[in-house]
């Protein structure tokens, strides 16, 4: 079957979404794209599993968002770093769940990252053969939709409609709650996916 998705897939599918918010809400599309391009540069092989492993091994801990900043400030261009604006670096650093970006463009990337992860995890679960669309509880699908396309359209449209004229990017309460609960549901599925990946690597080796 098709391989499970990686961080490049995450960018290719998530970035166009956050640019949709930017265009619809008259934000800075270039700033949004720059943050989206840089936000996961510091991610490890094997995604968050690799991040957790490095965090347990490094004396001062490891977080991919801090590593992304290190990449753009100190490692790129043979150690010279990139001449990025404060707004871009702020968006990269604060795209994490507990972060609070200072710009609406940064918030757009942060929201897109959450939405992309949910749909990627569902797609990976289906590809791995441990999940079907019909397995997703109706309390989530009734609000968000029954396919990746429907979920994306619902969440993107909801963000745009509820953020017009506001100094924030927000969701309606029903959509926000359904998305949050679906993330929790998919967390359990992701545990099974990680176990499957480990078994496949052992078979290859």
Task: Please describe what each predicted stretch is.
Residues 47-59:
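A glycine- and small-aliphatic-rich helix-loop capping segment at beta-alpha/alpha-beta transitions
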Residues 42-46, 116:
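Short active-site segment of divalent metal-dependent hydrolases/proteases
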Residues 33-38, 42, 111:
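Short alpha-helix carrying the canonical HExxH Zn2+-binding catalytic motif
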């Amino acid at each position: 079957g098709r391989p499970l998705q990686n961080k490049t897939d995450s960018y290719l599918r998530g970035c166009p979404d956050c640019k949709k918010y930017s265009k619809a809400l008259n934000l800075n599309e270039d700033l949004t794209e720059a943050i989206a391009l840089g936000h996961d540069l510091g991610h490890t092989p094997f995604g968050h599993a690799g991040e957790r492993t490095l965090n347990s091994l490094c004396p001062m801990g490891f977080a991919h968002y801090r590593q992304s900043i290190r990449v753009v400030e100190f490692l790129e261009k043979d150690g010279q770093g990139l001449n990025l604006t404060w707004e871009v670096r702020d968006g990269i650093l604060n795209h994490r769940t507990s972060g609070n970006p200072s710009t609406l463009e940064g918030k757009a990337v942060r929201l897109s990252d959450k939405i992309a992860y949910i749909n990627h995890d569902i797609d990976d679960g289906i590809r791995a053969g441990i999940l079907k669309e019909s397995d997703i509880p109706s309390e989530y699908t009734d609000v968000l939709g029954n396919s990746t396309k429907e979920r994306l359209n619902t969440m993107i449209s909801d963000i745009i409609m509820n953020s017009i004229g506001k100094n924030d990017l927000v969701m309606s309460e029903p959509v926000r709650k359904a998305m949050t609960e679906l993330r929790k549901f998919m967390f359990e599925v992701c545990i099974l996916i990680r176990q499957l990946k480990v078994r496949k690597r052992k078979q290859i080796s």
